[in-house]
């Protein structure tokens, strides 16, 4: 299950108690204080990693707790400190304080770490309180409690290419073709209920690092107002470097394909006004349903209505025209 939002309580460990103890040796009946300090409690640290893709591991968890520090011991022995708890989250995670809404950190780099809940300090044993005046202190202090923090985690996928389109525009079929993987395909709305990630290999430069492609669930009119799957998935376009609009141009009895693109542009602009700063390409999909002269007429219609956009005629089903996508990706993404 793809989980991209979660609330957790992160509890650091309590510090161990200091102890009162006395040095006891045969020839030192009054050997003085010998109680050790308590160990520090473990802290809770969040770490970003590219090896996990969602918060599924924490789906049924309300809180995570680091170990407590151990109490001190005789012979001036300090208690063992609690081990820090490392919470692994996907790169692209936005961390907020659940109580204030304050953004604490934006994890965009693999290996980034942030200490979120500090472990409690260990208490002091009576040896710590020995002075020239008080040579036999009977005082020891308890360990301090660890910090407890309620946080919200929100994932915004980091991908090179994001497939954007209405339900049943053929995004999943095209995704399977480009990423050489399989996601569920069907002729009904919202076949894709969660973003799918795949890798696209550059055909002309096989030594190059693959591109990450994301199949964003179908957008409907009013998505920016949280209709359909709405805002839950619109946010996944925010960090995508290149947007690939997928438009169904097959013969059908509904809105014109041009109106579909107009609506998609409106929805994305309403959610992220500066989205057009990204590289964009429009794939006119399902041309296997059109005759050659109809394909050319379709292309000219789009070019006339949207002169600032780049278009490619393709069939995700047959693979026709897909090489044009690879060429565009190479021009815009290859380094």
From Swiss-Prot:
Record keywords: Cytoplasm, GTP-binding, Hydrolase, Magnesium, Metal-binding, Nucleotide-binding
Record EC number: 3.6.5.-
CDD domains named in the record: Obg (cd01898)
Cofactor dependence: Mg(2+)
Annotated signal sequence range: none
GO biological process: ribosome biogenesis
Positions of the Obg domain: 1-158
Subcellular locations according to the entry: Cytoplasm
GO cellular component, one term: cytoplasm
PROSITE patterns, alphabetized: G_OBG, OBG
Binding-site list for GTP: 165-172, 190-194, 215-218, 285-288, 315-317
Location of the region described as Disordered in the Swiss-Prot/TrEMBL record: 126-145
GO molecular function: GTP binding; GTPase activity; magnesium ion binding
Family: Belongs to the TRAFAC class OBG-HflX-like GTPase superfamily. OBG GTPase family.
PANTHER family reported for this sequence: DEVELOPMENTALLY REGULATED GTP-BINDING PROTEIN-RELATED, MITOCHONDRIAL RIBOSOME-ASSOCIATED GTPASE 2
The protein, known as: GTPase Obg
Gene name of the encoded protein: obg
């Amino acid at each position: 299950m793809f989980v991209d939002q979660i609330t957790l309580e992160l509890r650091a460990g309590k510090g161990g108690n200091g102890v009162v103890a006395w040095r006891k040796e045969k020839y030192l009946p009054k050997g003085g204080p010998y109680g050790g300090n308590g160990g520090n409690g473990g802290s809770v640290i969040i770490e970003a990693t590219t090896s996990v893709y969602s918060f599924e591991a924490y789906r049924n968890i309300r809180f995570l707790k680091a170990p407590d520090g151990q109490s001190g011991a005789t012979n001036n022995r300090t208690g063992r400190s609690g081990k820090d708890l490392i919470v692994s989250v996907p790169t692209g995670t936005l961390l907020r304080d659940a109580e204030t809404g304050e953004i604490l950190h934006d994890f965009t780099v693999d290996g980034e770490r942030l200490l979120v809940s500090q472990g409690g300090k260990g208490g002091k044993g009576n040896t710590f309180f020995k002075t020239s005046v008080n040579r036999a202190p009977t005082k020891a202090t308890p360990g301090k409690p660890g910090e407890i923090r309620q946080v919200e985690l929100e994932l915004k996928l980091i991908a090179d290419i994001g497939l954007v389109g209405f339900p049943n525009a053929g995004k999943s079929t095209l995704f399977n073709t480009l990423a050489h993987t399989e996601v569920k395909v069907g002729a009904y709305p919202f076949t894709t209920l969660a973003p799918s990630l795949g890798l696209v290999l550059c055909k002309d430069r096989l030594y190059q690092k693959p591109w990450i492609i994301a199949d964003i669930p179908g957008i409907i009119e009013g998505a920016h107002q949280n209709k359909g799957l709405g805002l839950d998935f619109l946010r996944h376009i925010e960090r995508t470097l290149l947007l690939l609009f997928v438009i169904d141009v097959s013969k059908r009895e509904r809105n014109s394909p041009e109106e579909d693109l107009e609506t998609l542009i409106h929805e994305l602009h309403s959610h992220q006004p500066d989205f057009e700063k990204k590289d964009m390409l429009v794939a006119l999909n399902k041309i296997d349903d059109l005759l050659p002269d109809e394909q050319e007429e379709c292309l000219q219609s789009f070019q006339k209505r949207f002169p600032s956009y780049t278009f490619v005629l393709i069939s995700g089903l047959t693979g026709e025209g897909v090489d044009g996508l690879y060429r565009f990706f190479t021009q815009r993404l290859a380094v």
